């Protein structure tokens, strides 16, 4: 489970960096858990170079290395390239890790909502291998649903969108557009995640006021700024000119972490140094409770909501997952024929943060077609300029949602 959480964390930073290349100074928000889950369900059927590329991009390769080094097992001289074959026993820990996380997230609870689901929509005339259906159910609880892509693609699209909308409490609507589902579509693999929780310590609505949010040194926009004074775990990174705060949700099973640069320099958002230095190892180290100090804080945090919808096809190709999108794609783990390729990877996400807490949801469809300083005084933590944030499942240390807030949405 820890290895899969680390894989998702490394993928989070890689994906953010790639999205940042074309979205500088813009808001970015996505669910690395949702994207990784949908792609892992696809990876379950991948073979050869298709599987190797997917494993590299999703950081499954490191997880397998970690597994093989922790289990003292003599090498039988198998060719190295076989190591990440999804049928190979050593890839099993990847899929088992996803199963454990899925079970942990979907555990019944009264205090907050966290759930995630997978589903396979398949053209009713297209035969999937029983082994694939069995494994996808075993590891991903993914039930196959037969639909009529061939002659009723629009009806199939609506059915998928309705399922996603239901799974996400209507926060993700119209995940798939008419252009996404065609008569040539054979398979759509979908993951949905929904999260809603109240803060452990809530903001008082009467203390919320209109204040400026600085977009740059000279530009600002008004926002509804929430305020409270309370004790929170804080990390101060003087050398890197930023500080981080952990805002726990009720029961402390999940937290939002906010990474805030000390200030904005001319012509920047203030996030540049942090983004240059950002790695998953550092993020894990910073968010370690042993690194953080319980501090009395005057916390100012804007109310905000973000929504995004992206086709990740080009992004994933640029990250190195190329073969899966071509006629050379090999998904013979799900069919006898070598006639399937991924045509799109659609991801839609939503987050809303207010005085009570946070609501966040996301869905991903893979469309397959033919040092800390101790502070004794009150620390001012005023989030009035661009920042990074992520929502983490604390026990497994899995990043469920990750984002950058640069600009308040009208």
Curated annotation (Swiss-Prot):
Changing residue 138 to Q: Reduced interaction with DNA. It is found in: Nucleus; Chromosome. Residues 68-91 are annotated as: Disordered. The keyword Zinc-finger does not apply. GO terms for molecular function: chromatin DNA binding; serine-type endopeptidase inhibitor activity. Keywords: Chromatin regulator, Chromosome, DNA condensation, DNA-binding, Nucleus, Protease inhibitor. One of its GO terms (cellular component) is nucleoplasm. Changing residue 214 to A: Reduced interaction with DNA. DNA-binding protein that promotes DNA condensation into transcriptionally inactive heterochromatin in terminally differentiated avian blood cells. Promotes tight packing of nucleosomes into spherical clusters by binding to linker DNA and subsequent oligomerization. Acts as a cysteine protease inhibitor towards CTSL (cathepsin L1) and CTSV (cathepsin L2), but does not inhibit serine proteases. This is Heterochromatin-associated protein MENT. It comes from Gallus gallus.
């Amino acid at each position: 489970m820890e290895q899969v959480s680390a894989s998702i964390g490394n993928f989070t930073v890689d994906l953010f960096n790639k999205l940042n290349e074309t979205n500088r100074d813009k808001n970015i928000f996505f669910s690395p858990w949702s994207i990784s889950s949908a792609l892992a369900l696809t990876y379950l059927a991948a073979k050869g170079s298709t599987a190797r590329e997917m494993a590299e991009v999703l950081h499954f390769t490191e997880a397998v290395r970690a597994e093989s080094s922790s289990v003292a097992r003599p090498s039988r001289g198998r060719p190295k390239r076989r190591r990440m074959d999804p049928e190979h026993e050593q890839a099993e820990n990847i899929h088992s890790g996803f199963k454990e996380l899925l079970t942990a997230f979907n555990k019944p609870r009264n205090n907050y909502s966290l759930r995630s689901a997978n589903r396979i929509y398949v053209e009713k005339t297209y035969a999937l291998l029983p082994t694939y259906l069995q494994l996808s159910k075993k590891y991903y609880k993914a039930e196959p649903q037969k639909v009529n892509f061939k002659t009723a693609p629009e009806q199939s699209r609506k059915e998928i969108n309705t399922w996603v909308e239901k799974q996400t409490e209507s926060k993700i609507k119209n995940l798939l557009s008419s252009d996404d589902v065609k008569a040539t579509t054979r398979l759509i693999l979908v993951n949905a995640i929904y999260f809603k929780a109240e803060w452990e310590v809530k903001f008082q609505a009467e203390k919320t006021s209109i204040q400026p949010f600085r977009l740059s040194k000279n530009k600002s926009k008004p926002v509804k700024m929430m305020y409270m004074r309370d004790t929170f775990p804080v990390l101060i990174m003087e050398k890197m000119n930023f500080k981080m705060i952990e805002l726990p949700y009720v029961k402390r099973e999940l937290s939002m972490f906010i990474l805030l640069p000390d200030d904005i320099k001319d012509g920047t958002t203030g996030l540049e140094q942090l983004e240059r230095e950002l790695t998953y190892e550092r993020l894990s180290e910073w968010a370690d409770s042993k690194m953080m100090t319980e501090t009395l804080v005057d916390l100012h945090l804007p109310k905000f909501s973000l929504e995004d919808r992206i086709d990740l096809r080009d992004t994933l190709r640029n990250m190195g997952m190329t073969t899966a999108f071509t006629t050379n794609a090999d998904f013979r783990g799900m069919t006898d024929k070598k006639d399937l390729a991924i045509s799109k990877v659609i991801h839609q996400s939503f987050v809303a943060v207010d005085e009570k807490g946070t609501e966040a949801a996301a869905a991903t469809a893979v469309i397959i077609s033919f040092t800390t300083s101790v502070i004794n005084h009150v620390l001012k933590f005023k989030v009035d300029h661009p920042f990074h944030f992520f929502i983490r499942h604390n026990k497994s240390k899995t990043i469920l949602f990750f984002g950058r807030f640069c600009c308040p949405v009208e």
